[in-house]
Amino acid sequence: ALGATPADTDELLVSDAGTLKRVDFSHLKGGGMDLLNVTTLGADASEIIVDNVFTSSHDIYRFFLYNMKTSANADIHFQLRYGGASGTNEGSNAYVTRNHYAYNSGDGQQQNSHNDGYALLNGWTDLDANTDYGTSVEMTLFDPVDTEKYTTLMAHGTMYSGDGSYNEVVNTMMGWFTSKARSQTGFRLHPSAGNFKQYTKLLTYGMKLS
């Protein structure tokens, strides 16, 4: 039995009407998404960094961030990174963001931000550190390696508010684009205060074109 997924150039034997033929594994794979990275925190951490994950092999990336808790009431910041391993954060004046979010009381808010050093995943309200509710966020990032246009991202999530006015479940939707046309290679997540708690989990997928 195979101990791992074959490489694209590995050859497999296939029977064609009784005749054995060698076929590259790349011709047998279906379309869909490739799992590129799994991050599970074994201890509290001040940030999550994933480098060398964006390449020309995929145009669209999906992220699933869940079981996320913070040690202090905090915003969650998302930054792109460039330069490969030990890359550089895409920082000052790089992001334009629009957030919409609603509380279970029925109240809703929206927020716009321009020329920030990060994209804000949770709108105006902080995540509540003193809760059993784990935050879950799903994000889609489009073509981060294209140097001819700005990178765009859409996200939506469910969290528990640490805002004293709204201590309740919050649903958020956001979209942003960078104001820097640059080939991005990775990304960083970090809370504005405290740490990510142990067991926070992040899955990163790349979507294939065929």
Label every PLM stretch briefly.
Residues A1, T5-L20, D24-S210:
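Surface-exposed molecular-recognition determinants
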